[in-house]
Design a protein with these regions (language model features):
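Bilobed "Venus flytrap"/periplasmic-binding protein-like clamshell domains
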Residues: 14-36, 97-157, 161-163, 265-269
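A structural signal for short loop-to-beta-strand junctions that line the ligand-binding cleft
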Residues: 17-18, 82-91, 115
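Secondary-structure end/capping motifs
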Residues: 203-273
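Hydrophobic/proline-rich hinge and linker segments of small-molecule sensing/allosteric domains
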Residues: 85-108, 184-201
Length: 290
């Protein structure tokens, strides 16, 4: 289910920009400035829709559904004809990332003999999992139901994203593999997880203005951390303030303001490797607007 802003009157000569992102504390934190009108842009009005990331991935593939949308990097080649990546607003794991967890100790070689619950086949977590071992058997489960499904014995293991990376141990689960650690050891790079894409048809001027607005919103949240975190707490599933702050720090930081040359290289490396391994059927054409 998606949550949308209540409709408001749009003044004449105002461009309405639809923004969609996930209902996660890190996304809420970075969009705090725009969502609460702390950041305003003359001539532009921003509307916000909150959807789970797999829904956003699929909507952006079917059509240019939103002007700006959060996506998993894995999904980008499928929507690159209509969207380009923004140079800010992304989340990367620098030596950490999605995890395979289980209710019992498992060796890595055991994974090929079981079914693994995954949060969606368009997530970057799934792409990284398949690069790690393309033979693994998976089944899609809503991301917030993966831990309960493991606890109930429906799956021997699951691939967790979002806040589950911090709460799995309190649910009695054991970490089998951190894909962010594996990726760093394998490539020497950070693991790019999600970013924001903007509709190509908006044009260069709007691209520049909207990119700056998002960058200003991120900077505002970083500069007013306590207020932004208070706002984000309403989206922090099962996290207390301490854990929510830790989670936000993991995924909203200087890299969110700008990936940097090495961050952009990591995005290209991830997608190129997915294409070379036959996981992604479309050759990635990665470009950015700033």
């Amino acid at each position: 289910m998606c949550l949308e802003n209540s409709a408001v009157a749009i003044p004449p000569d105002t461009i309405e920009i639809s923004i969609a992102h996930s209902p996660d504390s890190d996304d809420a934190f970075m969009f705090y400035g725009l969502a609460t009108n702390k950041i305003r842009v003359p001539g532009y009005k921003f509307s916000h829709t909150l959807c789970d990331i797999e829904t956003l991935n699929l909507r952006a593939q079917n059509e240019a559904f939103y002007d700006v949308t959060a996506i998993s990097f894995h999904a980008y080649p499928y929507l690159q004809e209509n969207y380009t990546l923004m140079g800010c607003g992304g989340s990367v794991g620098e030596g950490y990332g999605p995890m395979i967890v289980s209710s019992k100790p498992l060796a890595l070689e055991d994974l090929s003999r079981i079914r693994i619950a995954v949060p969606g086949t368009m997530t970057t977590a799934y792409l990284a999992l398949k690069i790690f071992n393309p033979e693994l058997k998976t089944e899609t489960v809503p991301f917030d139901q993966i831990i309960p499904a493991i606890q109930a014995g429906k799956f021997d293991a699951g691939l967790i994203i979002h806040e589950g990376q911090l709460t799995y141990a309190t649910s009695g689960l054991k970490k089998i593999l951190d894909l962010g650690v594996w990726w760093r050891e394998t490539t020497g790079m950070m693991l790019p997880l999600g970013g924001n894409a903007i509709r190509r048809s908006l044009g260069a001027e709007s691209h520049k203005i909207i990119s700056q607005a998002l960058r200003d919103s991120i900077q505002h949240a970083l500069d007013h951390r306590e207020q932004a975190l208070d706002y984000a707490m309403q989206f922090a599933r099962d996290l207390d303030t301490r854990l929510a702050s830790r989670f936000v720090s993991m995924y909203v930081n200087e890299r969110t303001l700008d990936y940097g040359a090495d961050g952009r290289l990591a995005i290209r490396k991830l997608l190129d490797l997915g294409y070379e391994r036959g996981i992604i059927p479309i050759a990635p054409q990665v470009d950015f607007v700033d």
